[in-house]
């Protein structure tokens, strides 16, 4: 077997990033860059491997990037929803996990409850990948780190401002940044802060890595001299009934626009995990402008997840 990361990560889950250490994450990022540069070299390393994908939430980037990724590595994908499985009719997750482990080599699941993913991982004998839950979005964070690394050729000390809702994307970005040494500034209104336990975990990780974490209600304090400005939608899937209140609570103050971006570094880059609501969390001028790298960032979902698959499956 060829080792594609320095440590033996075969069989590891990816649930929240916390199953991995700094060195392993950086290895994945560097492998992702190598795969992007020379995809043909890796085109058969997962020959014969099957990835099962379970979707309880709509998906564009997660589904297409994972399905294309396993195919580009020589493997295959089976796409399912819980409604198509007996789990949707009440079969215990324990039984589903054990049975799936007899058929396929890994499961990627995109669902609402993070506890559901943890229970699946507890019972399964194969690696489980969190493709998004209400609490975490680790695969997005891998693509985010890769994009930052491509532009800066480093991660430590890079200044990243996140403006908006303290949601799953923010949680994973915060943990990832704390692990690798980013200078992270979060700006969000009261009532939309990040989970307290996740923030405390990130602060402990930052002590080990040298990362900096600064939380404020003032977007201008966060964005000042930033290398990257990141935002996400103010209303996530399942929160549609709260949309009017959320729009009012965030308002123009938390919108990434030309005025706010003007206090970042002159060569800053704009990030967004997509889908985006133009003229809400970000203006069209910014997201479609020269500083925006959102399509590179979205494209890196493919490469980062290919590297993850190579790391957790027994690549040839």
UniProtKB/Swiss-Prot annotation:
Q: Could you tell me the EC number(s) of this protein?
A: 2.1.3.3
Quote one Gene Ontology molecular function term: amino acid binding
What keywords does the record list, in alphabetical order?
Answer: Amino-acid biosynthesis, Arginine biosynthesis, Cytoplasm, Transferase
Q: In which pathway does it act?
A: Amino-acid biosynthesis; L-arginine biosynthesis; L-arginine from L-ornithine and carbamoyl phosphate: step 1/3
Classification via InterPro entries: Asp/Orn_carbamoyltranf_P-bd, Asp/Orn_carbamoylTrfase, Asp/Orn_carbamoylTrfase_sf, Asp_carbamoyltransf_Asp/Orn-bd, Orn/put_carbamltrans, OTCase_ArgI
**What EC class is this?**
transferase
The protein's annotated catalytic reaction(s) are: carbamoyl phosphate + L-ornithine = L-citrulline + phosphate + H(+)
Q: Which GO terms describe its biological process?
A: arginine biosynthetic process via ornithine; citrulline biosynthetic process; L-arginine biosynthetic process
Query: Which residues participate in carbamoyl phosphate binding?
Result: 59-62, 86, 110, 137-140, 273-274, 301
What GO CC annotations are associated with the protein? cytoplasm
- Subcellular location(s) per record: Cytoplasm
UniProt binding sites for L-ornithine: 168, 232, 236-237
Family recorded in the similarity comment: Belongs to the aspartate/ornithine carbamoyltransferase superfamily. OTCase family.
Q: What exactly does this protein do?
A: Reversibly catalyzes the transfer of the carbamoyl group from carbamoyl phosphate (CP) to the N(epsilon) atom of ornithine (ORN) to produce L-citrulline.
Q: What protein is this chain from?
A: Ornithine carbamoyltransferase
To which species is this protein native? Listeria innocua serovar 6a (strain ATCC BAA-680 / CLIP 11262)
**Lineage, broadest ranks:** Bacteria, Bacillati, Bacillota, Bacilli, Bacillales
């Amino acid at each position: 077997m060829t080792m594609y990361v320095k440590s033996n990560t075969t069989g590891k889950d990816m649930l929240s990033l916390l199953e991995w250490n700094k060195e392993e994450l950086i290895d994945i990022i560097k492998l992702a860059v190598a795969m992007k540069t020379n995809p043909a070299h890796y085109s058969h390393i997962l020959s014969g491997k099957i990835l099962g994908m379970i979707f309880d939430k709509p998906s564009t980037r997660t589904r297409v990037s994972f399905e294309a990724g396993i195919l580009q590595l020589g493997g295959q994908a089976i796409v399912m929803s819980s409604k198509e499985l007996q789990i949707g009719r009440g079969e215990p997750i324990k039984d589903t996990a054990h049975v799936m482990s007899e058929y396929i080599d890994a499961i990627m699941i995109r669902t609402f409850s993070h506890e559901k993913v943890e229970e699946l991982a507890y019972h399964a004998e194969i690696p489980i990948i969190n493709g998004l839950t209400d609490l975490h979005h680790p695969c997005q964070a891998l693509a985010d780190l890769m994009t930052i690394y491509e532009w800066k050729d480093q991660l430590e000390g890079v200044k990243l401002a996140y403006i908006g809702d303290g949601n799953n994307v923010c949680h994973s970005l915060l943990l990832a940044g704390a692990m690798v040494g980013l200078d992270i500034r979060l700006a969000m209104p009261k009532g939309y802060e990040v989970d307290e336990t996740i923030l405390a975990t990130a602060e402990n990780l930052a002590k080990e890595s040298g990362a900096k974490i600064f939380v404020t209600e003032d977007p201008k304090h966060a964005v000042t001299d930033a290398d990257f400005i990141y935002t996400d939608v103010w209303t996530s899937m399942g929160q549609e009934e709260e949309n009017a209140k959320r729009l009012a609570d965030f308002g123009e103050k938390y919108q990434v626009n030309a005025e706010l971006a003007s206090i970042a570094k002159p060569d800053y880059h704009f990030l967004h995990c997509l889908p985006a609501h133009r003229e809400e969390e970000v203006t069209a001028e910014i997201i479609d402008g020269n500083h925006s790298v959102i399509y590179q960032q979205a494209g890196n979902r493919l490469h980062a997840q290919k590297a993850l698959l190579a790391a957790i499956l027994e690549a040839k």
